[in-house]
A protein has these predicted regions:
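Conserved C-terminal helix/tail region of periplasmic/extracytoplasmic solute-binding proteins
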Residues: 82-114
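Secondary-structure end/capping motifs
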Residues: 12-94
Length: 114
């Protein structure tokens, strides 16, 4: 995945509505990116990159689209989780890999995509 989000189990348990609303918003953004061209996306975010030429920004976005860097749904699959941990390990940011079934909670993602 391009990115993943995490929270403590206690936070999730005590803030279920917030977690669901956040996940719904992420999914809405994922759908928007899927349904729009690189140029349209670049136009919508160009103000966040004032020193970047719109052509370069469009090219970068298209590159991400071409390699499927952005997931289309917020569900974190085992394969993506493993890849994320591998990247973090290679970067020296992760000492011990975590088991998927103990860490990942797709409950809110599954609800968002209904």
């Amino acid at each position: 995945p391009y990115t993943a989000y995490f929270a403590k189990k206690s936070y999730i348990e005590n803030n279920q509505t917030t977690i669901q609303n956040f996940t719904n918003a992420i999914y809405k953004g994922q759908k928007w990116v899927k349904e729009h061209t690189a140029k349209e996306i670049a136009e919508s975010i160009k103000n966040f990159f004032p020193d970047t030429d719109i052509k370069l920004l469009t090219t970068a976005i298209q590159s991400y689209k071409d390699i499927d860097a952005w997931n289309e749904i917020p569900v974190l699959k085992q394969e993506s989780f493993d890849k994320l941990q591998e990247v973090m390990s290679l970067a020296g940011e992760l000492k011990v890999k975590a088991p998927y079934d103990k860490i990942v909670n797709n409950k809110y993602a599954q609800e968002a995509i209904k």
